[in-house]
Every structure is written in structure tokens, then in C-alpha cells.
Amino acid sequence: MYHPRELYPSLGTGYRLGHPQPGADSTFPPALTEGYRYPDLDTSKLDCFLSGIEAAPHTLAAAAPLPLLPSALGPETAPPPPEALHSLPGVSLSLENQELWKEFSAVGTEMIITKAGRRMFPACRVSVTGLDPEARYLFLLDVVPVDGARYRWQGQHWEPSGKAEPRLPDRVYIHPDSPATGAHWMRQPVSFHRVKLTNSTLDPHGHLILHSMHKYQPRIHLVRATQLCSQHWGGVASFRFPETTFISVTAYQNPRITQLKIAANPFAKGFRENGRNCKRERDARVKRKLRGPEPVATEACGSGDTPGGPCDSTLGGDIRDSDPEQAPTPQEAASASAPPCGGPSAEAYLLHPAAFHGAPSHLPARTPSFAEAPDPGRPAPYSAAFLDLQPGPGGSAYQAAPSVPSFAPHFIQGGPFPLPYPGPGGYLDMGSKPMY
């Protein structure tokens, strides 16, 4: 870069508005002075606008100090600090689960953050005193960075590994009871167990957004306000607890923190040694999945005492047929009509639905009163094809109604029913409707 006076030495060492001066520079031709004369730059025209510009070049200097205020106004007072403008005198906050936080802090607290959001454990649980019982207050919580470093797990400890990521948008969690009276807040401890941490910058649920591998600390704010969105606040008090500092991670780095959270978190009981999600149980489930479904050892159809179907547990065992010699058992009917099968699932497709409920799969056999082999040229009468009709009383032309099968009371009075099943303790009113 060059200074203008180095590029145009003919302009002199100073700058001024006006006509070129012949004597200012010996290298400037005097004959050209009149050619570079501009009438608009006459001194008489510029005096009203540029009266402070001197004709000779000068150096810039600091501006003169402003005059002091008159003594009648008195000395100027310094503005009060922000803490004095927004404060709640006499209000104190204590951490209820301080011992638990200290136990984690001694090891190095880690908090899991996920895209969907993960709750904090331990959660912030505080007790407040010194509030006005009649006034209304808001309880807020936010999480702020502790320092400007990024951390990494190196060996058996955390150490800084570089500069922190740019700060994410600040979000505040509002306690769902807000606003409430001071008597309500002081009646019992205030818990922030619903706070969720996320690493998604596009989170639409209002969770607190954090960077992974950064150190944070929760802050709890108590605001005196009558409404949630009030612009007139009566005072603000903020509290921090050193033992609540944590490092956000996507997976636990310290094995001691993992064991401590399993032992202290009541919702992690499945990951304990006697839980369903312990390592031994997880490995066993993986092996079973890789091995495939185990074959079920079953006997041939009709060889057992009870039918092997999906509804075996509903059998009552108190069903008796009126004529066991005439009515075969469900096992005999299944074995006579179905080939040997290898499992209960195949038998379920071969048996009549009534067999699963212990009922005969067909009406009881009766001695027919017609010829066994009717003439093929003539169609069989209706009574011979479907019902066993008996002559009515007095030799009338009307036939008596057929008798009710012996298994019908089982479906009417209670017990297992064909579809639809009744509710617990209920009965299915069959009435005069057909059974199938």
C-alpha cells in the first residue's frame, strides 16, 4: 500500500481545498496554475461551509475535552449493578439431593444427550425458603457452559482437547407449576426431573441443546411475576451449585459412572446383575436369536389325553357327552380324519373349532328311520337329509321339533365359547340363534 503523498508528490505534504499554489511546489509549472483553477473552490464560497479548515496544512490532534457540567446539577452517580436491580432479598435455595450429586461429582458426572432428548440423572431437586406466601413466582432452569474448552476421555480422566464449539441457542426450561404462589413452592421440594438434553440443533420440542464433550452447569432462576409472559418482574434470583457440573456425552466414557448410575437410578434396574438387561441375559437372548426357533417336542395327534391346540389352557375337564358310545371324542375324530401331524400348529388347522373347547365336532349320531341307500333316481326327502323327524302326537301332519344336542348347554350357561369370546365373568346369550 502507498500513501497518497507518495503517489502524488506534486500535491505537497498537506491536503487543502483550494487552487494549486505556484510557490508550494517547485516542480509544479506556474503556467498551468490558471488551467487548474476552479471557480467553485474560491475561498469566499467555502468559508460558510468549511470555516474550520485552515489554509496551511496541519496535523490531526485530539479533540478538546468537553466542558464540565454545571455545579448546580450535582456530581454524576454511577448506575447500580444489575444484581441490585433484580434481586430477591432473603430468598435461599438448597439442593435436596446434594449427597448424590457429590457422589457423582467425585467420579466426574456425565450426562447422556441424544437426538430425541434424554433426561438428567441425577436431576436437580431443590428447596426454597424466604418467599412471599402470597406473591407468585416462576421457576426456570437453563444449562450454561463452564469454560471455553472441549474435553476428551484420556486413559482414566478427562482433559481439555481444544477450543469449544460455538455456543448454541440458549433455551430455558420453565417448571410446569409456574406461576405459583410462594406458599406452593415452599410447601415441598421442587424437582426438575422432566428436563431433557439433546444434541439436535433442529429440536422442535424445546429440549435444552448442548454440545457433546463439553462441560456444563445448570442454573436455577426464581422470578417474581404474576404471569408467565409478564414484562413487569418484581425481582430475579439465580443460583448455581458447584457439584452439579457435568460433561455431556453420547455414550458413557467412565466405567465407574456407568456402574454408579445403574446402582443409583431406579429406572436402570434392568441393567443390574439380577435384571433382565444384565450382560448375561443379553448374551443369552442374542444366542437364542442366532440359533433360531427351538423345535417343540409333541406327540402324534390323538395319542394324548387332551387335544394339543392353542386353547389348551381353557379346557375345563367337566364336559361329558350323554352317549359316549355314540359320540366319539375329539381326539378320535381328529385322528380318524387327519393324518399324523408334527405340532399343535398343524393340528389347529385340521380340528373342528369346537374341539379346542372340549365339545364334539358333530351332532350325536342317531339311528335313521329311512333306508340307508335311497334310490339314486329319486332325490332324498328333506327329513331324511337333515333331521330325524318323529310323528307328532295324534298322528298330525306336523312333525315334532328335534331335540337339542347335548353340548348346547355348555355354550349357553358359561365356560369357553366359540368366537366371539365374552368378557371375564360374562355369558354369551345364544337364545334361538344357530350355533354355527
From Swiss-Prot:
SMART domains: TBOX. Residues 274-284 have a biased composition (Basic and acidic residues). GO terms for cellular component: chromatin; nucleoplasm; nucleus. PROSITE patterns: TBOX_1, TBOX_2, TBOX_3. One of its GO terms (biological process) is negative regulation of neuron projection development. It is found in: Nucleus. Residues 100-273 bind DNA. InterPro entries: p53-like_TF_DNA-bd_sf, T-box_DNA-bd, T-box_sf, TF_Brachyury, TF_T-box, TF_T-box_CS. Keywords: Developmental protein, DNA-binding, Nucleus, Transcription, Transcription regulation. Gene3D superfamilies: Transcription factor, T-box. Residues 274-344, 360-383 are annotated as: Disordered. Residues 332-344 have a biased composition (Low complexity). GO terms for molecular function: DNA-binding transcription repressor activity, RNA polymerase II-specific; RNA polymerase II cis-regulatory region sequence-specific DNA binding; RNA polymerase II-specific DNA-binding transcription factor binding; transcription corepressor activity. Disruption phenotype: Defects in the differentiation of paraxial mesoderm. Irregular somites formed in the neck region of mutant embryos, whereas more posterior paraxial tissue did not form somites but instead differentiated along a neural pathway, forming neural-tube-like structures that flanked the axial neural tube. These paraxial tubes showed dorsal/ventral patterning that is characteristic of the neural tube and had differentiated motor neurons. Embryos lacking TBX6 show also randomization of the direction of heart looping and independent alterations in the direction of embryo turning. T-box transcription factor that plays an essential role in the determination of the fate of axial stem cells: neural vs mesodermal. Acts in part by down-regulating, a specific enhancer (N1) of SOX2, to inhibit neural development. Seems to play also an essential role in left/right axis determination and acts through effects on Notch signaling around the node as well as through an effect on the morphology and motility of the nodal cilia. This is T-box transcription factor TBX6. The lineage of its organism: Eukaryota, Metazoa, Chordata, Craniata, Vertebrata. The gene is Tbx6.
